[in-house]
């Protein structure tokens, strides 16, 4: 039936205890299906025809410690006298006779325990229910799901927070009953006294909460020290001083509006810009490290950013004005006047994208000064002898502004980002204003003062 296997089955010399041969070894099919030992090592095993009548029962237990996938086959007729011949291609591993005797001595109806090292078939899909594993997944106080070990005990977030609040606020509770209230998942909030006592009984440590608080305080102090030392080169106090030093006096602001002026809005804006250009140089000199740059680089930076610096200044000054802007000269320019003069489009952008936003977030003068310093330290300005130094100064202003907003407005974590979002709008509006001024200079029907004219005659220094 199976023929001779000598042409394809080869085993090492002495394999399975058989005599050594110099060439290949011819084996019978029954020997090939064994574990490698010759069948004569099991004298009780003989070839049995498949058709022999026999009542069989399958016991759902792995056969040996190797984890065979086949079930033990036993007979109601007593111990087996042989093995069933398996179909070709299936290897039935014959167990040692000692294990087979143990299995056969057990009643078929009895629950057979798995051999050491193997999981039982009946409980393979069930999670571990050992006491140690349950402790890690259940809150020791109320029995809810544990989120980890807190203050020395596995507990849920609710009991962890309750214990921490009790210790930090030094709370004192009283029990309305006999101080033996049931504390479980459903009733843990009914009696705070008994809940706290159970926390202590189960092993929660008061000192663990106090140590955690001390570590948090030390970490906050360390971060504050690092922040202050990192911003010593660009203190926000000096930036604020620069803003206040060049701020127009309040008494110079009158109730004048466009009806009190004989000039058109564009002329008034140009006069105010020329006046502010003189104070702009003084402001820049007060910004930390600006004067440390070469004189040539100082001039380049001022020429590159003067328009944005002035627009930011009068926009912030105008947050208290209704539907208009307040110039440094004290004049109010109303929206309707700007539209009649042909500059309504850019005027509307100033009110919408700058003045309104500054008003909504209540931008203070320190934040305004930092934004203007960021504009001033522009490493992209053409012709700089040391752009990397300018970029370093800008980054220091970034860090100063971020630290200031975190300390002054801790309830507004996104404030720093909102401030920086005003810079693209400021750049875009500044470029548009330059286009208008160049146009007015070209047609020559608007008087432009000396300093402003000098700025306009210089090629634009922004990439």
Curated annotation (Swiss-Prot):
Q: Where is the composition biased (Polar residues)?
A: 21-33
- Return the CDD domains for the record: NR_DBD_RXR, NR_LBD_RXR_like
Would you indicate the residue range of the signal peptide?
Answer: none
Q: Which residues form the NR LBD domain?
A: 231-459
| GO CC, any one term | RNA polymerase II transcription regulator complex
| Pfam families cross-referenced by the UniProt entry | Hormone_recep, Nuc_recep-AF1, zf-C4
Q: What is the protein name stated in its UniProt record?
A: Retinoic acid receptor RXR-gamma
Q: Gene for this protein? A: RXRG
């Amino acid at each position: 039936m199976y023929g001779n296997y000598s042409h394809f089955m080869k085993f090492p010399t002495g394999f399975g205890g058989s005599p050594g041969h110099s060439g290949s070894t011819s084996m019978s099919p029954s020997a090939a299906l064994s574990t490698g030992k010759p069948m004569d090592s099991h004298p009780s095993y003989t070839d049995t025809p498949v058709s022999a009548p026999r009542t069989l029962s399958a016991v759902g237990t792995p056969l040996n410690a190797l984890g065979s996938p086949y079930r033990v086959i036993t007979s109601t007729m007593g111990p087996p006298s042989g093995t069933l011949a398996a179909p070709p291609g299936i290897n039935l591993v014959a167990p040692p006779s000692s294990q087979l005797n143990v299995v056969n001595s057990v009643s078929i109806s009895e629950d057979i325990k798995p051999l050491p090292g193997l999981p039982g078939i009946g409980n393979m899909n069930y999670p571990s229910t050992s006491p140690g594993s349950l402790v890690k997944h259940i809150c020791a106080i109320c029995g809810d799901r544990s989120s980890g070990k807190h203050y020395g005990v596995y507990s849920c977030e609710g009991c962890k927070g309750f214990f921490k609040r009790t210790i930090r606020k030094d709370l004192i509770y009283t029990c309305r009953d006999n101080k033996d209230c049931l504390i479980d998942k459903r009733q843990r909030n009914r009696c705070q006294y008994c809940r706290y006592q159970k926390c202590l009984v189960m092993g929660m440590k008061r000192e663990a909460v106090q140590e955690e608080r001390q570590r948090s305080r030390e970490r906050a102090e360390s971060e504050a020290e690092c922040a202050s030392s990192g911003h010593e080169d660009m203190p926000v106090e000096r930036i604020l001083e620069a803003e206040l030093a060049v701020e127009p006096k309040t008494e110079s602001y009158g109730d004048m509006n466009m009806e009190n002026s004989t000039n058109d809005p564009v002329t008034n804006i140009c006069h105010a810009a020329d006046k502010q250009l003189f104070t702009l140089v003084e402001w820049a000199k007060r910004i930390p490290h600006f004067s440390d740059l070469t004189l040539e680089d100082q001039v380049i930076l001022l020429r590159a950013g003067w328009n944005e610096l002035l627009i930011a200044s009068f926009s912030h000054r105008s947050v208290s004005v209704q539907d208009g802007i307040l110039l440094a000269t004290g004049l109010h320019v109303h929206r309707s006047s700007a539209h009649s003069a042909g500059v309504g489009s850019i005027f509307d952008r100033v009110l919408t994208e700058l003045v309104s936003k500054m008003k909504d977030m209540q931008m203070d003068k320190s934040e305004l000064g930092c934004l203007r310093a960021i504009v001033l330290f522009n490493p992209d300005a053409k012709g700089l002898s040391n752009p990397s130094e300018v970029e370093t100064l800008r980054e220091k202003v970034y860090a100063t502004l971020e630290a200031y907003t975190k300390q002054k407005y801790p309830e507004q974590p996104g404030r720093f980002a909102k401030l920086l979002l005003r810079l693209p709008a400021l750049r875009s509006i500044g470029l548009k204003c330059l286009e208008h001024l160049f146009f007015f200079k070209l047609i020559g029907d608007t008087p432009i003062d000396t300093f402003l004219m000098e700025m306009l005659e210089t090629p634009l220094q922004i990439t």
